[in-house]
């Protein structure tokens, strides 16, 4: 799967879960579970409750995603 196949959405952090995982509400009112990307972990970027984030998802599983940017 190439990077072109990934879908990006904007959402809001609703809940902080263990192991750098978050419950995110997308702009289209869908809820997903997302984890932080490796680059965000490496640079120790903190994500807090209520933050606006960009989530990257695969078209094969629309219930899981990866947080790639914090606004």
Curated annotation (Swiss-Prot):
InterPro entries: NA-bd_OB-fold, RNA-binding_domain_S1_IF1, TIF_IF1. SUPFAM superfamilies: Nucleic acid-binding proteins. Residues 1-71 form the S1-like domain. The keyword RNA-binding applies. Keywords: Cytoplasm, Initiation factor, Protein biosynthesis, RNA-binding, rRNA-binding. One of its GO terms (molecular function) is ribosome binding. It is found in: Cytoplasm. GO terms for cellular component: cytosol. PANTHER family: TRANSLATION INITIATION FACTOR IF-1, CHLOROPLASTIC (PTHR33370:SF1). Component of the 30S ribosomal translation pre-initiation complex which assembles on the 30S ribosome in the order IF-2 and IF-3, IF-1 and N-formylmethionyl-tRNA(fMet); mRNA recruitment can occur at any time during PIC assembly. Belongs to the IF-1 family. One of the essential components for the initiation of protein synthesis. Stabilizes the binding of IF-2 and IF-3 on the 30S subunit to which N-formylmethionyl-tRNA(fMet) subsequently binds. Helps modulate mRNA selection, yielding the 30S pre-initiation complex (PIC). Upon addition of the 50S ribosomal subunit IF-1, IF-2 and IF-3 are released leaving the mature 70S translation initiation complex. This is Translation initiation factor IF-1.
């Amino acid at each position: 799967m190439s990077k072109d196949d990934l879908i990006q959405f904007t959402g809001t952090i609703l809940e902080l879960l263990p192991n750098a995982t978050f419950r995110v509400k997308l702009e289209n009112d869908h809820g997903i579970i997302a984890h932080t990307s490796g680059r965000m972990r490496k640079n120790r970027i903190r994500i807090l409750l209520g933050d606006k984030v960009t989530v990257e998802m695969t078209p094969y599983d629309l219930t899981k995603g990866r947080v790639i940017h914090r606004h």
